[in-house]
């Protein structure tokens, strides 16, 4: 990449998509990145963000960012129809492609099945390449700071296997945010740390944003609609006929987008079914292992008792039970 290309890439808007479990602080993180409260953020288990929202801003360092706040895209309690619509909506808002996907986790809560599903579902929908654009952001920095702890201290307390896997897959790109801080220096510092990771993502991908098959299909469909509407407007049709043609074009476009949503919905259902099978298999294996462990322990205890009884000459009736007294008698004769 030459100097002019680097300058162009630096000035280009970077699409930053926030994903994660409802209640982890995606909206608050979006506000921290932008530098003001633009997304509604409240500590509610049901979440506040009901649909994908976007806001463009310029960081103190001059980076132009487009932050896309999402609802619980992979929330197990919502329908596949809703999720598929919002995934399509998210890709529409990321004009030019995805520069960074931020998996927002919280140090306040344990890793849930939903969060584990988020990663695998991203891979199913977009392929393993999406991991090259992944950053893991931990909220709850205020809680760690109150206990004089760092993010590394948090990991030393016991890092779940899922986290080790995620961080390994994304080259350990992680950062902690304190979305509650009033310290202006702290606010700027944590955004700079985040943008340093964004720069690493860009370097790894040679400045190219993620544009998977789904994104390209949405882009193509959107451009088709614009082109067709422009052609219709340029024609000498009457007002009523023009409105009719535009309506028909929009209906055709909506039908195609609906087909795309159905495709995403089916992929999500397949992923969900695979997760259920995997969890069921894991639970079955754990139960079998638990039963085997109990059986082994019983067998071990039985053998140990048997050996002790033999050593004491109390274990087996008959000849074996006479070994100890016979041995003592022989010793006395000798």
Swiss-Prot record:
Gene3D superfamilies: P-loop containing nucleotide triphosphate hydrolases (3.40.50.300). Mostly expressed in pollen. Also detected in lateral roots and radicles. Residues 139-142 are annotated as: G4. SUPFAM superfamilies: P-loop containing nucleoside triphosphate hydrolases (SSF52540). This is Immune-associated nucleotide-binding protein 3. Residues 20-27 are annotated as: G1. Residues 178-180 are annotated as: G5. GO terms for molecular function: GTP binding. Residues 11-219 form the AIG1-type G domain. Keywords: Coiled coil, GTP-binding, Nucleotide-binding.
């Amino acid at each position: 990449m030459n100097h002019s290309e680097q300058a162009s890439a630096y000035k280009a808007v970077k699409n930053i998509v926030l994903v994660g479990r409802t209640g982890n602080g995606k909206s608050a993180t979006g506000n921290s990145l932008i530098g003001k409260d633009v997304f509604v953020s409240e500590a509610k288990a049901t979440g506040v963000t009901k649909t994908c929202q976007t806001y463009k801003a310029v960081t103190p360092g001059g980076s132009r960012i487009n932050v896309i706040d999402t609802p619980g895209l992979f929330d197990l309690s919502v329908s596949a129809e809703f999720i598929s619509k919002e995934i399509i909506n998210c890709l529409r808002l990321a004009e030019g492609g995805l520069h960074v996907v931020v998996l927002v986790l919280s140090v306040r809560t344990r890793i849930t099945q939903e969060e584990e599903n988020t990663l695998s579902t991203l891979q199913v929908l977009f392929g393993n390449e999406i991991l090259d654009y992944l950053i893991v952001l931990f909220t709850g920095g205020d809680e760690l700071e109150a206990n004089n702890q760092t993010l590394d201290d948090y990991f030393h307390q016991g890092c779940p296997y899922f986290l080790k896997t995620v961080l390994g897959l994304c080259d350990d790109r992680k950062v902690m945010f304190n979305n509650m801080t009033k310290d202006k220096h702290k606010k700027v510092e944590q955004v700079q740390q985040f943008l340093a990771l964004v720069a690493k993502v860009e370097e790894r991908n040679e400045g190219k944003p993620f544009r998977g098959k789904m994104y390209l299909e949405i882009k193509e469909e959107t451009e088709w609609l614009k082109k067709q509407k422009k052609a219709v407007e340029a024609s000498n049709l009457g007002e009523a006929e023009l409105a009719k043609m535009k309506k028909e074009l929009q209906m055709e476009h909506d039908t195609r987008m609906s087909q795309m949503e159905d495709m995403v919905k089916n992929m999500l259902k397949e992923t969900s079914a695979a997760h259920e099978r995997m969890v069921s298999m894991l639970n079955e294996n754990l139960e079998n292992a638990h039963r085997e462990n109990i059986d082994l322990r019983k067998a071990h205890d039985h053998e140990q008792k048997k050996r002790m009884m033999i050593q004491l000459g109390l274990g087996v009736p008959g000849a074996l039970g006479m070994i100890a007294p016979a041995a003592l008698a022989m010793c006395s004769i000798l």
